[in-house]
């Protein structure tokens, strides 16, 4: 990557970080760790 500009490298790094955080969020929302999450709307008495 010696011929590419610093701006392109920075843009790729930011893109990879954002995709990683998005993947982590989806994994935490729907993966095995989601079994322990509670829905406060289900526990609320009307």
From Swiss-Prot:
GO terms for biological process: photosynthesis. It is a single-pass membrane protein. Keywords: Membrane, Thylakoid, Transmembrane, Transmembrane helix. The chain crosses the membrane at residues 10-30. It is found in: Cellular thylakoid membrane. Its main location: membrane. InterPro entries: PSII_PsbN. GO terms for cellular component: plasma membrane-derived thylakoid membrane. Belongs to the PsbN family. May play a role in photosystem I and II biogenesis. This is Protein PsbN. It comes from Prochlorococcus marinus (strain MIT 9211). The lineage of its organism: Bacteria, Bacillati, Cyanobacteriota, Cyanophyceae, Synechococcales.
């Amino acid at each position: 990557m010696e011929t590419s500009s610093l701006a392109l490298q920075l843009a790729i790094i930011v893109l990879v970080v954002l995709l990683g955080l998005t993947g982590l969020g989806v994994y935490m929302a729907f993966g095995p760790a989601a079994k322990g999450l509670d829905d406060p709307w289900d526990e609320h008495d009307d």
